[in-house]
Amino acid sequence: MAEAILLETENTPCGCRSYLMAGLSYLGILCFVPLLMSRDDEYVYFHAKQGLVLWMWSVLAMFALHLPLIGKWLFGFSSMGVLVLSVAGLASVALRRTWRLPLVGYFVALI
């Protein structure tokens, strides 16, 4: 199971630009910057796709506010989940790893 979540990064470039772009992937709408600028870098593209899924999740959570009664709760839990997963993604970039985030990794495979 751990092999499916943690991918090896032996052949990733060690440039500072790659890690900066990968870090931008988890900062909301800034996920589009590495997605459009670094399509040839596999390490950055992996993190950008995960950041895109997290951003789409946060946008969908905003629409949940329009639901009566449970909208605020759904938005709160979704926002908390996105925040925790974004911090986990930033930690994986800081550790120079490619870690499939839980639940997000499934949707990234569909992109």
Swiss-Prot record:
Residues exposed to the Cytoplasmic side: 1-17, 72
Topology of this chain in the membrane: Multi-pass membrane protein
Domain of life: Bacteria
GO annotation, cellular component aspect: magnetosome membrane
Keyword Membrane: yes
Protein modification: Probably subject to cleavage or degradation.
Keyword Electron transport appears in the UniProt entry: no
Record note on disruption phenotype: Deletion of the probable mamGFDC operon leads to a slight reduction in magnetic response and slightly narrower magnetite crystals.
Keyword line: Biomineralization, Magnetosome, Membrane, Transmembrane, Transmembrane helix
Membrane topology (Lumenal): 39-50, 94-111
Subcellular localization: Magnetosome membrane
Membrane-spanning residues: 18-38, 51-71, 73-93
Main localization of the protein described in the UniProt heading: membrane
Function: Plays a role in regulating magnetite crystal size; partially redundant function with MmsF.
Note: This bacteria makes up to 20 cubo-octahedral magnetosomes of about 45 nm in diameter which contain membrane-bound crystals of magnetite (Fe(3)O(4)).
Family per similarity comment: Belongs to the magnetosome MamF/MmsF protein family.
Listed name of the protein: Magnetosome protein MamF
